[in-house]
Structure formats: C-alpha cells, structure tokens
C-alpha cells in the first residue's frame, strides 16, 4: 500500500512539474505574440538601405582614365582593368573593366580613392544568381542605372532597420500598432522644403 501511495505522489509531482514547464513555454509564446513583427515580407516589402550602404558598384566608362588606382587599393586586387596605350594622343585608353561581385568584399576602397569618381556605390544588394560566373560584371553590366527600392512601384518600402519608436529600449511594452521610428519616403518628400523660384 505504501509503495502504491509513493508512486501516486511521485506521478502527481511529475505531472505538476510538466504542467508548469508547459505553462512557462506558453507564457514565452504569448509574450512574443504581443510584439511587433521583425520579419519583412520579401520580395513584396524591402528595407530601405541606410544612407552609407555599400551595395553594387556603379561604373562610368567615359570617366575612367585607366590609372589602376582601384586595383592597387583593393585588398584582394579584384578589379580587372584592360587598356591599351594610344600613341596618337599619348594616353591610356580603356578597353574593358570588370569586377567579380562573387569575390568582392564591398569595402568601397576603389570608390573612395578613384581620382575621377567613375566608381560609386549603389543600394543594390540583390546579386544572387544560379551561376557564380554571372556575378562577374563587365563595364556594360556595371554601367546600368542603379536600382532604388523607393522607386519600385511593385514593392512596399519599409521605413528603416530600427523597429522601435524613438527613446524606447524595450519592445515588450510597445503596442504592435504603434508607428515605427523614422519616416516613410512620402513623409521625407513632404517635409523637404521646396526650392524657391525667383520671380521677375
């Protein structure tokens, strides 16, 4: 009889402990349900990159003087500059320029040190392909106009990377319907003062 009572008591303790652990897990789950979502419904929603975001490098063929400064400052000597010397004008003439974005570390040293500003960083970060050889961009591919998230009519731009309102450190107490920090592109345009036109 005593053995049976001990078994019942131990079973009751284990059941109570299991129920307590399940309750703790559900409490964490319900706590997360109150929080605002941090996921983005990509590709229908996209985050607006920050002001100094370093994405795909844009190249302007006509500005390049084939000085190869970009190759010297690159930590991995990545840019390929193919040029020939024109004896008539006694200057280098660029024939071909390419960067392999599958190897590029996006440090933007080439952009910073370029003497003619023929290189610039864009906010493009979608460089995925099925074949890694397609990431080797030549001067034609690098010369196309950069893509902007805010100018795509098929995409909803999300305000920014920060999801909490200003001066708020803990996300537990913030209502999930509260506005995000920062401004939307439309609000930025509306708050920008228009240039004054001279009449007369």
Swiss-Prot record:
Listed cofactors: [4Fe-4S] cluster
Residues that, per the record, bind [4Fe-4S] cluster 1: 64, 67, 70, 114
Membrane topology note: Peripheral membrane protein
Residue segments, region Disordered: 175-200
Keywords, in A-Z order: 4Fe-4S, Iron, Iron-sulfur, Membrane, Metal-binding, NAD, NADP, Plastoquinone, Quinone, Repeat, Thylakoid, Translocase
Gene Ontology cellular component terms for the protein in this record: plasma membrane-derived thylakoid membrane
Gene Ontology molecular function, alphabetical: 4 iron, 4 sulfur cluster binding; iron ion binding; NADH dehydrogenase (ubiquinone) activity; quinone binding
GO biological process, any: photosynthesis, light reaction
Domain 4Fe-4S ferredoxin-type: 55-84, 95-124
Iron found in the keyword field: yes
InterPro entries (alphabetical): 4Fe4S_Fe-S-bd, 4Fe4S_Fe_S_CS, NADH_quinone_OxRdtase_chainI, NDHI
Keyword Iron applies: yes
Cellular compartments annotated: Cellular thylakoid membrane
SUPFAM superfamilies listed in its UniProt record: 4Fe-4S ferredoxins (SSF54862)
Entries under Pfam families matching the protein: Fer4_7
Binding-site positions, [4Fe-4S] cluster 2: 74, 104, 107, 110
Self-association and partners: NDH-1 is composed of at least 11 different subunits.
HAMAP family: NDH1_NuoI (MF_01351)
Role noted for this protein: NDH-1 shuttles electrons from an unknown electron donor, via FMN and iron-sulfur (Fe-S) centers, to quinones in the respiratory and/or the photosynthetic chain. The immediate electron acceptor for the enzyme in this species is believed to be plastoquinone. Couples the redox reaction to proton translocation, and thus conserves the redox energy in a proton gradient.
Protein name: NAD(P)H-quinone oxidoreductase subunit I
Species per Swiss-Prot/TrEMBL record: Acaryochloris marina (strain MBIC 11017)
Source organism phylogeny: Bacteria, Bacillati, Cyanobacteriota, Cyanophyceae, Acaryochloridales
């Amino acid at each position: 009889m005593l053995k049976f009572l001990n078994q019942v008591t131990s079973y009751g303790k284990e059941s109570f402990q299991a129920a307590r652990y399940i309750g703790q897990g559900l409490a964490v789950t319900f706590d997360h349900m109150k929080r605002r979502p941090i996921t983005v419904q990509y590709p229908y929603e996209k985050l607006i990159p920050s002001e100094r975001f370093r994405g795909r490098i844009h190249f302007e063929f006509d500005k390049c003087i084939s000085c190869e400064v970009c190759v010297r400052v690159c930590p991995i000597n990545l840019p390929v500059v193919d040029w020939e010397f024109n004896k008539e004008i006694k200057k280098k003439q660029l024939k071909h320029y390419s960067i392999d974005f599958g190897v590029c570390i996006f440090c933007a040293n080439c952009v910073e040190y370029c003497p003619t500003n023929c290189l610039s960083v864009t906010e493009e970060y979608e460089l995925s392909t099925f074949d890694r050889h397609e990431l080797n961009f030549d001067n034609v591919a690098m010369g196309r106009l950069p893509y902007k998230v805010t100018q795509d009519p098929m995409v909803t731009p999300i305000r920014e990377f920060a999801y909490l309102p200003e001066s708020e450190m803990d996300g537990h107490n913030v209502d999930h319907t509260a506005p995000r920090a920062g401004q939307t592109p439309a609000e930025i345009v509306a708050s920008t003062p228009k240039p004054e036109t001279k009449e007369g």
